[in-house]
Amino acid sequence: MSSNRSQNPHGLKQIGLDQIWDDLRAGIQQVYTRQSMAKSRYMELYTHVYNYCTSVHQSNQARGAGVPPSKSKKGQTPGGAQFVGLELYKRLKEFLKNYLTNLLKDGEDLMDESVLKFYTQQWEDYRFSSKVLNGICAYLNRHWVRRECDEGRKGIYEIYSLALVTWRDCLFRPLNKQVTNAVLKLIEKERNGETINTRLISGVVQSYVELGLNEDDAFAKGPTLTVYKESFESQFLADTERFYTRESTEFLQQNPVTEYMKKAEARLLEEQRRVQVYLHESTQDELARKCEQVLIEKHLEIFHTEFQNLLDADKNEDLGRMYNLVSRIQDGLGELKKLLETHIHNQGLAAIEKCGEAALNDPKMYVQTVLDVHKKYNALVMSAFNNDAGFVAALDKACGRFINNNAVTKMAQSSSKSPELLARYCDSLLKKSSKNPEEAELEDTLNQVMVVFKYIEDKDVFQKFYAKMLAKRLVHQNSASDDAEASMISKLKQACGFEYTSKLQRMFQDIGVSKDLNEQFKKHLTNSEPLDLDFSIQVLSSGSWPFQQSCTFALPSELERSYQRFTAFYASRHSGRKLTWLYQLSKGELVTNCFKNRYTLQASTFQMAILLQYNTEDAYTVQQLTDSTQIKMDILAQVLQILLKSKLLVLEDENANVDEVELKPDTLIKLYLGYKNKKLRVNINVPMKTEQKQEQETTHKNIEEDRKLLIQAAIVRIMKMRKVLKHQQLLGEVLTQLSSRFKPRVPVIKKCIDILIEKEYLERVDGEKDTYSYLA
């Protein structure tokens, strides 16, 4: 007797697929036609699947006729009730295929938005229904499907994935071209400014993404994007390239580059938003690269030409826009950096040339001109170029070039003119004057000075001139502010190190020590016989101060006692130390009793010595003054010129032009008893012109000598470490080591090498061209 339901020996039921399929298919049909379903009905369908999968079948029935059993992972051929499911799987697959084949008929003739509406709506419905079906078949998924996949059988999927695969094969592939073309048309409409239904595109994209199943692992999480990339993205990117190639070419033909940049900026932003609104995020980088290539890279030459125009016209906003665009291209900024460097260099040269000869003798004008150029382009680099390191470097190179070599340095025939003028500008800032700025403003100005200092190649020249001027300010007690002096030295120390400022700091220390010494000397005088005049000194350590020893001079008798008392006092405190008096730097005050008014004259020691002679006589020849003061004739002539111009002394012919008269030994110089001045306190201690010129020449000479010593020291250091070195390598290392202080000239380095060979620090290696070895 035959029956579809019979008991096996173990008492388990055997349920045939035909018994449940009609009702199951009706339920599935209900799901895919989006009819409402009660929970009880859903459970009935689930139970059908469960009962079938757990019924007892023979292994060949479970797998299906003609399907060879697959090996398990342990090499066994399993069989049994827990593996029933193939026949059900086949029928589900067939159902989905038939459903989609019929559905395709409704959409295969549709185009443009109609096909998109059809595709996205059907996809949403199908996807939802398939998830419901997946739930009904949960037991089948967990057991039979899982086992088949574990066994490595191809073409078996979870039921939801099976639904996607069937959609891909039966509906997506036939409609793919129509749908993709419709999407691309819609995107082009949006690019042309039309409003579109973006949900249609996002629906298609979401479908394409989900259809990218992992064929090798049915249970893998997340799509592979294969379908999306191959069926949509590649065509979308090609379309994008075509669209923007045409648009950019046409736009540039009809509009200025500045307007094109705004357009390109807007388009790049649009495409970025496009991805955010309805494309897959993985498209972002590829799309950006494609747009940048078409909108920017293909037009770089036009950008480069326009960059120069924008610099000339100071169009900072447009320059910033160009930077933002071109910075998207790999190595795209190189040409812009070169153009900026050349432009700043030319602007700097032009600005200094415009000042003309005036800047040669006006440190403030010169430095301010340099700072104005730097300030302008530093602001540009910060605002338009985002303080990009490459553009900062371009600014630095350009400033270094025009500051160290320009119209002023050419007029002076010396690249050392810039550091000298900068040092003189510092002197004008730090010296007492009626125009001294407030402390905060002065600090800010000193910071600006350091901006220029950074670009100075010959920092040793600056140091020499700065040291000389600082020394004078300290000796003449002419500093506007001790705090400002200390601040500037601190800035220089930070920029160049301790060694660079060590002498400057020792000068400060000497001034402090001298103050204490004066107090001690005054105390000493109160305990003995006091002097009949106010006397103070400054004792300076000879190695730290940039002063030459004094020339011959006979101290006036009025000062002799003070001189002797202090010399004895100092010797009692510091045995073995020798004092060398710097009369040319000394000064004092004379009170007059020979004129209608009583004047206080602030005079140099040389001026005092000459004027004090007139306490005994009203007139002297130049020779007599030379004999009594022991001042050399060339210096005496300069001192007398100043006294004659101030009208304290006059020539025998009182109406003679002082500048035109040559002072000879027999020239008579008289005290002018009719001297008048609006001020009762008169400063006649002004620097002598020839003294200034001589000092400048001496400074430059000292710089050259110091450089030779520094170069020799660097060569010895390098050779001591390297032992043997080729000529070119040695030159390179010397230049590198000394570049922070100055730029050594190659002929001078060669000369220093020869000097060291003569001194037997080095020798040339026999048989090897241009090679030196160190002699310990």
UniProtKB/Swiss-Prot annotation:
GO CC terms of this entry: cullin-RING ubiquitin ligase complex; Parkin-FBXW7-Cul1 ubiquitin ligase complex; plasma membrane; SCF ubiquitin ligase complex
Tissue: Embryo fibroblasts and embryo preadipocytes.
Keywords: Host-virus interaction, Isopeptide bond, Methylation, Ubl conjugation, Ubl conjugation pathway
SMART domains: CULLIN (SM00182), Cullin_Nedd8 (SM00884)
Annotated GO biological process: animal organ morphogenesis; apoptotic process; cell population proliferation; positive regulation of canonical NF-kappaB signal transduction; protein K48-linked ubiquitination; protein monoubiquitination; SCF-dependent proteasomal ubiquitin-dependent protein catabolic process; ubiquitin-dependent protein catabolic process
Regions that span the bilayer: none
Glycyl lysine isopeptide (Lys-Gly) (interchain with G-Cter in NEDD8) crosslink location in chain: 720
GO MF entries: ubiquitin ligase complex scaffold activity; ubiquitin protein ligase binding
PTM (free text): Neddylated; which enhances the ubiquitination activity of SCF. Neddylation prevents binding of the inhibitor CAND1. Neddylation leads to structural rearrangment in the complex that allows interaction between the E2 ubiquitin-conjugating enzyme and the acceptor ubiquitin. Deneddylated via its interaction with the COP9 signalosome (CSN) complex. (Microbial infection) Deneddylated by murine cytomegalovirus M48 leading to a S-phase-like environment that is required for efficient replication of the viral genome.
List of residues that carry Omega-N-methylarginine: 63
Pathway(s) annotated for this protein in UniProt: Protein modification; protein ubiquitination
InterPro entries: Cullin, Cullin_CS, Cullin_homology, Cullin_homology_sf, Cullin_N, Cullin_neddylation_domain, Cullin_repeat-like_dom_sf, WH-like_DNA-bd_sf
Domain Cullin neddylation residues, every copy: 706-766
Gene3D superfamilies, A to Z: Cullin Repeats, Ring Box Chain A, domain 5, Winged helix-like DNA-binding domain superfamily/Winged helix DNA-binding domain
Assigned protein family: Belongs to the cullin family.
PANTHER family found in the cross-reference section: CULLIN
Quaternary structure, from the entry: Component of multiple Cul1-RING E3 ubiquitin-protein ligase complexes commonly known as SCF (SKP1-CUL1-F-box) complexes, consisting of CUL1, SKP1, RBX1 and a variable F-box domain-containing protein as substrate-specific subunit. Component of the SCF(FBXW11) complex containing FBXW11. Component of the SCF(SKP2) complex containing SKP2, in which it interacts directly with SKP1, SKP2 and RBX1. Component of the SCF(FBXW2) complex containing FBXW2. Component of the SCF(FBXO32) complex containing FBXO32. Component of the probable SCF(FBXO7) complex containing FBXO7.
Free-text comment about domains: The Cullin neddylation domain restrains the RING domain of RBX1 in the E3 ubiquitin-protein ligase complex; this restraint is removed upon neddylation of the cullin.
Function: Core component of multiple cullin-RING-based SCF (SKP1-CUL1-F-box protein) E3 ubiquitin-protein ligase complexes, which mediate the ubiquitination of proteins involved in cell cycle progression, signal transduction and transcription. SCF complexes and ARIH1 collaborate in tandem to mediate ubiquitination of target proteins. In the SCF complex, serves as a rigid scaffold that organizes the SKP1-F-box protein and RBX1 subunits. May contribute to catalysis through positioning of the substrate and the ubiquitin-conjugating enzyme.
Record-given protein name: Cullin-1
UniProt organism field: Mus musculus
